[in-house]
């Protein structure tokens, strides 16, 4: 056995607490220097080495977390559960308050478009004699949100592609900051800006659309040329409001495109646009769809901005250029101030429907995003 191999074999047995062979001699240069400094024989025998060197005590591995870890875990768990508890309490409250209305109105609550409370002989609202229907508001909610998605999502995805693959670093940093600030703007600011700035511009474009595309049913004007404060204007405002959401999500997903796939596309002679179309788009498709669904949920639940730029009318309006429409959230805001105690319960029922719609849309969006992340990992 060579000296080097004997040294390592002896060191291994020593570390394990095993007996060393009597012929083993520790010839480490460091050990010899230390022995000479102490006036000892540099050729240390195995018995002397094993008796003079204190082996480290065996370490115990414990799985019990420390107190600080347990406290932190409890705080984080409590914070996560509190959001679910609050969400559940809101759902229970809306269901409890709106139960009588839903029971009395039945399917008419979802198919009717008339909102009129009838007072009974006792001075209270008679739910059976009253007419509470949100069909017009439900359709208006879907129309405004759809317009917002059709206009806002292409702009947001294009912006995210530019910021990820084309923009210089300085421009990217500034644009990301502005987009993040837009996401934090209050809704009333968007509403006021839409009313004073976007509405006149939207009326001009609505007239052009009606002039050249009035053969399409949704662009016709059956009730006269009332272009002001139409669902198109509300959809434009909502499009501006959802652009930051879709842009941020899409930009993060495009930035996660694997570098090896990008380099492989370039190595095959592809241009940057070919790489984006054949590599980045397929990779980020599910995430972009999930971000779009989240933006759709935001657009469906928007209240103040829509209320500011849209004429609230209780009739089903499929003509997006006509200045009449509404959504569930703006209807609740409009009626809540003058509502009686019983009518408030009807508004709670409308809020329950809106809550369920946004919850379903957001759940689908989270499912799509999670599946996209798992698929990429």
Question: Which role does the model predict for each range below?
Answer:
Residues 58-70, 74-75, 95-148, 168, ...:
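Periplasmic/extracellular loop-to-transmembrane helix junction in inner-membrane transport proteins
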Residues 296-341:
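Glycine-rich helix-loop "coupling/hinge" segments at transmembrane-helix boundaries
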């Amino acid at each position: 056995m060579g000296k080097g191999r004997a040294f390592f074999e002896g060191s291994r047995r020593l570390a394990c607490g095993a007996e060393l062979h009597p012929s083993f001699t520790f010839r480490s240069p460091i050990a010899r220097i230390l022995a000479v400094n102490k006036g000892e024989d540099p050729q240390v025998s195995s018995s002397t080495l094993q008796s003079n060197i204190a082996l480290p005590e065996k370490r115990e591995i414990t799985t019990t977390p420390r107190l600080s870890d347990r406290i932190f875990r409890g705080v984080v768990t409590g914070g996560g559960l509190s959001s679910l508890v609050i969400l559940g309490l809101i759902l229970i409250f809306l269901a409890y308050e709106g139960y009588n209305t839903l029971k009395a109105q039945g399917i008419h609550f979802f198919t009717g478009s008339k909102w009129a409370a009838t007072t009974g002989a006792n001075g209270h609202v008679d739910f059976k004699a009253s007419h509470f229907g949100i069909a017009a508001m439900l359709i208006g909610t879907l129309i405004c949100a759809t317009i917002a998605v059709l206009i806002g999502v292409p702009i947001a995805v294009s912006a995210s592609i530019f910021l990820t693959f084309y923009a210089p670093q300085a421009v990217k940093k500034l644009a990301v900051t502005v987009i993040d600030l837009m996401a934090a703007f209050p809704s009333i600011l968007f509403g006021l800006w839409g009313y004073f700035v976007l509405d006149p511009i939207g009326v001009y474009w609505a007239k052009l659309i009606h002039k050249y595309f009035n053969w399409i049913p949704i662009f016709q004007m059956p009730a006269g040329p009332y272009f002001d404060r139409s669902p198109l204007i509300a959809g434009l405002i909502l499009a501006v409001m959802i652009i930051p959401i879709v842009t941020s999500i899409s930009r993060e997903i495009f930035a996660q495109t694997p570098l090896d796939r990008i380099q492989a596309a370039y190595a095959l002679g592809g241009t940057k646009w070919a790489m984006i179309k054949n590599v980045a788009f397929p990779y980020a498709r599910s995430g972009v769809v999930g971000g779009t669904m989240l933006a759709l949920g935001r657009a469906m639940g928007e209240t103040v901005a829509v209320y500011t730029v849209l004429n609230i009318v209780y009739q089903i309006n499929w003509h997006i250029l006509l200045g009449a429409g509404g959504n569930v959230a703006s209807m609740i805001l409009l009626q809540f101030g003058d509502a009686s105690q019983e009518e408030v319960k009807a508004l709670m029922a409308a809020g329950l429907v809106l809550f369920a719609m946004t919850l379903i849309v957001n759940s689908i969006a989270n499912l799509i995003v999670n599946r996209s992340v798992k698929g990429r990992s």
